[in-house]
Amino acid sequence: MRALFATLFIFSTSVHAAAPQVDWLFPIGAQRGSEALAQIGGKYNWPLKVWSEADGIKFVPEKEKKGFYRIKVNKDVTPGPYLVRFYDANGSAPPRVFFVSKAVDVPEKEPNNEMLKPQVVASLPAVIQGKFGKGGDVDSYQFSLKKGQTLVAQMDAYTAGVSMDALMLLRDARGMKLAFNHDAHSLDPRLIWKCSRDGDYVLQMACFKFPANSNSSFDGGADRVYRVTITNGPWVRHTWPAAVSEGVSSKIRLVGWNLKNEVVSVNDPEGEVSVLPTEAANGPWRLPVLNRAQEVEKEPNDNNETANLVRFPVTISARIDKPGDVDRYAFEAKKGERHRFDMDSFEDGFLLDGQLSLEDSNGKELSVNDDSNKKR
């Protein structure tokens, strides 16, 4: 009996000494200057402490409700994604992403499965905070648009660490399919559509399991959480150029939809990121600041005679303007030197499948690389 007691005691101690496990957080965001009630799921001893990347995001545990927090977001918190980490004396759970938005939060209200019985979103822009709560769940949201307006609807889920592959479908009031998107900047969908007539429209969403299995049915569960920003106003897709150099003032063009003031001045940038002000629902825009020189591509540079001359180290901002476009850059190198060339595009949310090739001054190909580390 004494031996059995000792064995059980040791087992119990080892279980309670484990670091907390937090499988999901819902909702995964809130509007700045607001409060929200959030819940976590997993295995942990209550209450857990919370570290936030932003000082203005506070998680206050509800002592009488295990797993629930009152989240307070200060007005001065810059909108965007932030890391939060749940921890106790035994360790920490992996960090999770929490989004702070400018637009009004709209919590999902079930039932909203049917296209003809959707949840009504009173005004745009809005950020839907929802979840596909069970297998087969479809969420439907209705809103109004006017002729000529461009709708932008973007989901954040997979990019926030949620294991699902979602889709979006836009219908008119009669149920006719108008637009569809499955994957955009990642497995998360982004739907763009220009309205052709005044009316009410319904955005429907569902998800598949990821990684995929042999089941083709829509997936769902407590951890299948998402946020969707819906707007008929400004939205930034990217900038040109894609970065700035430290201490170098630049004019940056915002590229996207429904934009009015498309050019922003960046003066003497420093640090790792420069925050660009914009009225866009997904603004402000965080622009990388480089600690090296940047060259912006100058066309034409399709052949060796017109190649842009660069000096190392350098980052080049460029674009493939049309099918068949080839960009060339000339540089000097000495025998025995080693140089590394990296292209970032797919990782930054673009669909380009780029290729790098190295030629000598006579045009002879010395090396070529298409895909590196299983990425495009």
Q: Model segments located where?
A:
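Predominantly extracellular/luminal regions of secreted and cell-surface proteins
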Residues: 95-124, 281-313
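Sec-dependent N-terminal signal peptides
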Residues: 3-13
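Intrinsically disordered, low-complexity boundary segments flanking structured domains
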Residues: 8-9, 85, 113-119, 215, ...
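Acidic, Ser/Thr/Pro-rich low-complexity intrinsically disordered segments
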Residues: 18-66, 75, 79, 88-89, ...
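Hydrophobic or amphipathic alpha-helical targeting/insertion segments
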Residues: 81, 85, 95-98
